[in-house]
Amino acid sequence: MDLRVLVHNVKGFKAGPEQAAAAVAEHVPDLAMITEAGTRRRLERYCRALEMEPAAPSLLPLARSVRNAVLVRPPWRVVRFHVHRFHASRRFYPRGVVVAVIGRAGYRVHALAVHLGLAGEERRRHAEELTDLAVGLQGPVLVGGDFNESARSPAVQWLTERYWDSWAHGGDRDSAGSTFPSNDPTSRIDYLFVSEQVRVDGAWVLADETARASSDHLPLVVDVTLD
């Protein structure tokens, strides 16, 4: 089963939900892993523009919630999801992960949308907490989001010891895969990690004018095949 995955920090849709959707629409993602998803209304507008369905705490009446989201395009559907807030996360900007099970025609995939913080020690602790959370998940696992650090930093290294880094295994060899800042990308801080049941067929960063204007992060798109 083929699956196209989008990873994007949309910065609260400050450029507008429709603008963010226009940046990725032609690539028709089956699954989107969104960070800084913003308000309920803006996320709903983004979903409508892309004809996708959400699993997101932003659609629940919770104050100061984790602002990540997992979106799917029919015939994929959200089977269930829950939100895990990382321990010792800041009260006014909580970090965490949305853990969703998505399904289609007998396939089940675990999709984890994560946003790590700005402090290195905190990121490492939360990366360990993330992998503990994923222990025992059956079937394909996709972990995507904004990790706020480079590939050689401790939290990302922790994950690459346990999952495949999709860019390292399928990224454009003529590109560094940098996603931040969008107006002059020099850092690869947005990632998709996949479990061994998933084959990476290709990965690329969208860097045209529309993508650059949609957020301070560029979108990452990855094609995978599920065993």
Residue ranges and their predicted role:
Residues 1-49, 226-227:
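N-terminal, active-site-proximal structural segment of metallo-dependent hydrolase catalytic domains
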Residues 2-12, 80-82, 99, 107-117:
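Active-site-proximal beta-strand elements of phosphoester/diester hydrolases
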Residues 10, 37, 114-116, 145-147, ...:
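Active-site metal-binding loops of divalent metal-dependent hydrolases
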Residues 12-15, 39-42, 63, 119-122, ...:
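Active-site environment of divalent metal-dependent phosphoester hydrolases
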Residues 31, 35-108, 202-205:
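Structured beta-strand-rich core segments of catalytic domains in phosphoester-bond hydrolases
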Residues 32-36, 57, 142-146, 165-168:
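Active-site neighborhood of phospho(di)ester-bond hydrolases with catalytic His/Asp-centered motifs
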Residues 89, 135-139, 149-227:
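Metal-dependent phosphoester-hydrolase catalytic domains
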Residues 100-104, 108-110, 124-147, 155-156:
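His/acidic metal-ligating clusters that form di-metal
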